[in-house]
Amino acid sequence: MNSTFVQIPKLNINKQVKKKTDSITANTLLPKLMNDTSIQQPNQQQQQQQPQQPQQVTNGITILQNYQPQQPQPATTTTQQLNSANNTPTLVSTKKSVIGINEIPEHLLIRDIIYVFQGIDGTYIKYNKQSDSFKIDENTSNTLVNGEPAYISKPKRDLVYRLCEFGWLFKKVRLFITNNDFKKTGLTNQSFCSAINDELIELYRIIAILETQVYKKFDMVNYGGGGGGSGGSGSGSGLESPSSVSSGGTTTSTEIPFIDGDSLTLIRLFVWIQSPLKRLKVLGTCVDSITVDMKGGEILSKIDTLSKHGDQDIRILIHNIMFKICQPLFSMIRLWMFKGEINDPYQEFFIRQYESVQLEKTWKEKFAIVARLLPSFISLPLSKRILIIGKSINYMKQFCNNFKEDKNDRYYYYNQEDDDDDDEDHDDNDDDDENENQGEDDEIIERKLLIKESKIIKEKTKELNYINKEVLQEIIELVSRQSSERLLKIVLNRFKFMNHVKALKKYLLLGQGDFIQYLMDLIGEDLLKPTSQIQRHKLVGWMDTAIRNSNAQFEEQDIVNRLDIALLPERPGNIGWDIFSLDYHVDTPLNTILSPNDILRYKKIFHFMWGIKRVEYSLASIWRKIRSSTSLSILSPIGGDIHKSHLIMNEMVHFISNFQYYLMFEVLECSWKNLEKFIDQEATDLDQLIEAHHQYLQDICNKMFLSNSDSCYECFKKLLSIIIKFTLLQTKLINLSIAIQNEKNFNETHQAQVNKEFNSFRNHLNNLYQEYTTSFYKFQSEILKVKVNQDLNPISLQYMLDFNEYYEEKKDN
């Protein structure tokens, strides 16, 4: 018989005994084993109740696995017997402590820890809702090991609690992502839960690997390797049974897959989970930063903040999560920028659409940015550009039904569906560009360039995600320029925006002088009547006459048809001059750009300038009557007063003429020049065009003292009212001279009345002039106080009103 050395299985015996048994051969060990009376041999009755004990072959001789040399205080070995009734392992023995109770085996604690890692209660470790933590069950002391209470030592207990942190985090994260109230709030919420769940699946994989190691050890401890022998109840220990020994005294060598010193322990488990625990802590931080009522950009901003971390591993993990949860956002951005549509069932997109907005407010109020839903990695200026791109496309789709069919338009190619055949055709055409371009006109070449541009943009769009979010800036640069250019062309060429603004300047800002003068000549007398006697249809007829007899007849018919007469709300004591106003009708889609508020501002400016025109018209009428009157010669007794009235009238004409010059050139023309220059050279989108027009009106109002100085405006209105009173006084004097001239029986009584009228005229004239001079000086001082835009120097107006310092010297005297 050949003697061979094999490894003795690891037994829970004294080290000295182990060393001896490792160094002796089976030939010398067998007689000692057979003659050792200290070994308790099971009786025949016990052998029938228990499964056949496994045997081990050493040097060709079968050795009982349960062999233990007798010691003064023998230490029991740790094994587990399989309960044949319920097939569950039960504790058999543990290493006895000095206090007389048994310690729970470590591999059972490890098995519980694996459950805890998944947020599941174990046998000894359970979740405590009150303390919100996993704790060792208080009933653990009731566990019996060899009929004695079991316990967990303090070092192991501390280590178990440190390991339970993993399970507590896992449970918290899993509970959050399974919250349906959070998921139903938005697509971003669902993506967030999905991304976190993907990370949990990876942790499940790690837990499964650990669980495999645990149950491998658990099987080896309980079943000795778990293969199941041929005898007994099938619960073999993995060691070879006696029945496997051959009749010739030889046995087959069986490898025992018993876990040796490299087996899984609590300490090893604690070390191995540090990296997964680090990832789980990041997931826990993500969950803690989110509340149930958050959605869209609020979630993205919170998680994006966590990505700014010095630890590269954490930064990469957050980037991976952000990559997934940003997909709904970037899908909405793509749809918005290329289709002008918003598919946002949960109201989580940072651009909100308001369906109930009036049609004329479509551009300004239909779409707006919701600041709280704007992600932190998209700046406010960038979001405004995104808003303008989508608004432009939506506006064109709503008001320009056939713009997509224009194959010379870039937008036509942006919105073509991806078609492989078309792409192949385009690629084929691209290969022959050099040859074909020689015989093609500029339109076809431009169209091919547009196709190339659209393909470049589409390719960049496919790369758009959180990791490559810089691509969004490039896409915006390309798409914004093209869509804005297209919309500006539509507004300026198809809608003829500048033609309408010019028409407003001509008629509501009194730029068409011949038409305005002719109209005033026709309706001047009617406007002196009380408002109750003013008939609108009659005024409209006079306006049509003025159009036919002035250069307005050469205007486009569309513009002429938009002109109308509007009567302002009446006030007690008003006459026709006070309520008359020209009107300009603006319909859809032009009214989305020239809003009703803009038209109201035009009317406000018209009313102000119309009042100045009325004063000018009244002074001119008085001057004509005086020059044509032959009856004033009989007013020689008040010749000095009449001369004085002429001087006063000249001052008033000088004031009105210079102020009108200031309005027409310093205000209207300069503002118009700035508007034209901006639109031609600087405007890149419709918002800038609208803003430029608003600034144009604002500059006019500021320079006319309509919005920046109530005191100047009131002083000027008072000056106009004084001039109107003066013209009425002059008219009364002319009528008096005519009455005297027509009186055939002029007597002393008449002379007394005439003298009384002369004295009244003189007094009124002096009072009016004194009031006019006082108001004029006050107006001069007020305009010096006004600080308006840098392009307006109030000193220029003051210089025009007193260029020869006449009023300055008069004031000093």
Swiss-Prot record:
Residues 416-439 have a biased composition (Acidic residues). Keywords: Cytoplasm, Cytoskeleton, Microtubule. It comes from the Eukaryota. The keyword GTP-binding does not apply. The keyword Cell wall biogenesis/degradation does not apply. It is found in: Cytoplasm, Cytoskeleton, Microtubule organizing center, Centrosome; Cytoplasm. Residues 69-81, 238-252 have a biased composition (Low complexity). GO terms for molecular function: gamma-tubulin binding. Its main location: cytoplasm. InterPro entries: GCP (IPR007259), GCP_C (IPR040457), GCP_C_sf (IPR042241), GCP_N (IPR041470). GO terms for cellular component: centrosome; cytoplasm; gamma-tubulin complex; microtubule; spindle pole. GO terms for biological process: cytoplasmic microtubule organization; meiotic cell cycle; microtubule nucleation; mitotic cell cycle; spindle assembly. Pfam families: GCP_C_terminal (PF04130), GCP_N_terminal (PF17681). Residues 69-88, 231-252, 414-439 are annotated as: Disordered. Belongs to the TUBGCP family. May be involved in microtubule nucleation. Gamma-tubulin small complex (Gamma TuSC) consists of gamma-tubulin and SPC98. This is Spindle pole body component 98. It comes from Dictyostelium discoideum. The lineage of its organism: Eukaryota, Amoebozoa, Evosea, Eumycetozoa, Dictyostelia.
